[in-house]
């Protein structure tokens, strides 16, 4: 994995989050992906389970919920790459309404491992809410 490929993947990740398109989300991840929303959570395993979680279709502990359209944005950048491992940082912003002011900002760190097709096979998210 190189820096350009990592940035392309991160941009696709943000795009998939904004679209909530099943195929776009699935294309990011290896079939046997291990995905953690928090480092100490039990992982979500497998691309189908990750997609269901992103789409708010899963009731598994730690699963995601769908955000309202146009109420969030994010920018992530790779900061370290070692072979197939990428560490990225960035921030995520949320608004209560699409036209409203930013009400929450989170600083993020992703630790990811990729396969030969640049699909993520391990994903762990760390984040903290800005004060």
Q: What residues fall within each predicted segment?
A:
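Hydrophobic residues positioned within well-ordered beta-strands of beta-sheet architectures
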Residues: 74, 88-90, 108-110
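A solvent-exposed, acidic/Ser-Thr-rich amphipathic alpha-helical stretch
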Residues: 3, 23-84
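A short hydrophobic beta-strand element
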Residues: 81-94
């Amino acid at each position: 994995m190189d820096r350009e490929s990592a940035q392309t993947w991160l941009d696709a990740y943000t795009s998939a989050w904004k679209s909530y398109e099943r195929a776009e989300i699935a294309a990011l991840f290896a079939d046997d992906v291990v995905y953690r929303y928090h480092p100490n959570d039990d992982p979500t395993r497998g691309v189908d389970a990750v997609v269901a979680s992103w789409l708010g279709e899963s009731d598994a502990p730690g699963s995601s919920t769908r955000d309202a359209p146009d109420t969030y944005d994010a920018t992530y950048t790779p900061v370290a790459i070692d072979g197939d491992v990428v560490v990225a940082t960035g921030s995520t912003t949320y608004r209560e309404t699409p036209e409203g002011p930013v009400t929450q900002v989170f600083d993020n760190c992703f630790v990811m491992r990729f396969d030969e097709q640049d699909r993520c096979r391990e994903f762990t998210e760390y984040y903290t809410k800005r004060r």
